[in-house]
Amino acid sequence: LARETSVVRLGALVTGNTYRNPAVLAKTVTTLDIVSGGRAQLGIGAGWFELEHDAFGVEFGTFTDRFEKLEEALQIILPMLRDERPSLDGKHYQVKDAINHPAPISRIPVMIGGSGEKKTLRLVAQYADESNLTCGLDEVPRKLDALAAHCQRLGRDRSEITVSLQTRACVARKQFSRLSARRC
């Protein structure tokens, strides 16, 4: 895909942090950036699909564990994507002067997926370029208010963060009743 396109940004919408070592993930995304001529992006989240974790033999952990891991991972990944050599002696991850050479061609944007107002949106305000919300349209204003509050508390300009919404669409040849459409 990187070879066949020249404009499209490339990356997973949101990968569960729990599946990969964060330093290796940073190097993987950097490789994608290099082979695509600077078009990589990183979408990441705490991980949510317990059945998939079980099927892959990956520890799912508690809600708290997954968010602790995500924050530690961001403290490793972001500096590596910015051509720095981070060290971290965390509860879940340890790196020492983690190397990421060759460096990315571009400044790789980082998107955090999820809609948790206390943890996820704080991490977005602190670390991310984009927030990919996973909520109903009626919840978006409240989520944006929560994100703005985190940004204000952290001294970050909310307008620096792009917001996208992951939602469902039902495409069909015939009209459905509202109830049928909800089942899509």
Predicted regions and their residues:
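Active-site-adjacent structural elements that line small-molecule/cofactor binding pockets in enzymes
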Residues: L1-C184
